[in-house]
């Protein structure tokens, strides 16, 4: 099975649990090979984090359930990669600023 191989999420979460705990909880799910969490904004009570998850045949509903059980809210799905292999994004002339 191929299914979803990478998903990138923008998440708002409370300061607790720590991102280390969130990463370990997510990696306990089946089919997840790795998790990368980056904090890009901190407010008084919350953190905005970018979560990149890679694996094979990822179950978005399971991932969302874990995030919500830890007090997180998914703001957006910023990238999804599916299929037999991961295709990296290619820059085009439209991407220039």
Curated annotation (Swiss-Prot):
SUPFAM superfamilies: MTH889-like. InterPro entries: DUF211, MTH889-like_dom_sf. This is Uncharacterized protein MJ0319.
């Amino acid at each position: 099975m191929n299914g979803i191989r990478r998903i990138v999420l923008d998440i708002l979460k409370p300061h607790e649990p720590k991102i280390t705990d969130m990463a370990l909880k997510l990696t306990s799910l089946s089919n997840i090979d790795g998790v990368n969490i980056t904090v890009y904004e901190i407010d008084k009570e919350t953190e905005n984090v970018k979560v990149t998850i890679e694996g094979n045949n990822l179950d978005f509903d399971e991932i969302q359930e874990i995030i919500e059980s830890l007090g997180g809210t998914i703001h957006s799905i910023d990238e999804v990669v599916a299929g037999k292999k991961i295709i990296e994004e290619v820059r085009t002339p439209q991407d220039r600023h």
